[in-house]
């Protein structure tokens, strides 16, 4: 069984990795638990520090930020893994939605899991479930194949 939990209690000398979902359009969608997590961790690893800085400023969160973007994901994952092993509590966020779901994060989550680091899911807004909820469909099964490619014209 993997070290994955849903609470903010820590009984381990190692750090924990919090995978925190962020708003997909309305800052009011961020949960109290996500705000508490972002406020109390030692470091926030984010896809784009400029974007996350705006979110933190809006919520008066002063936790230090470190960039964690796709082009440097392997290198940054190693750096963050060392911090986790040293006992740091780290939140991982993407610009909008859930890290590792069509956004950076899977490499760090995998490395943390392999190293025995506890991983805590802090659920939040989801574009796909929001779209399904208002589509009027009665489907119980669906497939998410990722985002459409960016229009380059």
Feature locations, PLM:
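Conserved helicase motor
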Residues: 66-75, 147-152
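Glycine-rich, flexible N-terminal cofactor/catalytic loop recognition
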Residues: 2-70
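Short, structured surface patches at the beginning of a domain
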Residues: 57, 69-82
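Short, glycine/charged-enriched secondary-structure capping and boundary segments
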Residues: 33-36, 58-61, 80-82, 104-109, ...
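Glycine/small-residue-rich loop that forms an oxyanion/phosphate-binding "nest" at active or ligand-binding sites
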Residues: 77-126
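Phosphate- and divalent-cation-binding pockets in alpha/beta enzyme and binding domains
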Residues: 54-55, 100, 129-131
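Class I SAM-dependent methyltransferase SAM-binding "motif I" and its flanking Rossmann-like core
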Residues: 107-153
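Generic beta-sheet signal
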Residues: 16-20, 87-94, 142
């Amino acid at each position: 069984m993997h070290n994955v939990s849903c609470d903010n209690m820590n009984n381990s000398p190692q750090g924990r990795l919090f995978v925190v979902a962020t708003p997909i359009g309305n800052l009011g969608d961020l949960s109290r638990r996500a705000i508490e997590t972002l406020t109390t961790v030692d470091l926030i690893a984010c896809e784009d520090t400029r974007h996350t800085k705006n979110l933190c400023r809006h919520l008066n969160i002063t936790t230090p930020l470190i960039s964690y973007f796709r082009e440097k994901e392997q290198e940054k994952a190693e750096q963050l893994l060392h911090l986790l092993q040293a006992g740091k509590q780290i939140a991982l966020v993407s610009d909008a939605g859930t890290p590792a779901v069509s956004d950076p994060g899977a490499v760090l989550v995998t490395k943390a899991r392999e190293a025995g680091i506890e991983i805590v899911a802090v659920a939040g807004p989801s574009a796909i479930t929001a779209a399904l909820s208002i589509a009027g469909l009665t489907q119980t099964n669906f497939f998410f194949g990722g985002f459409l490619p960016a229009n380059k014209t």
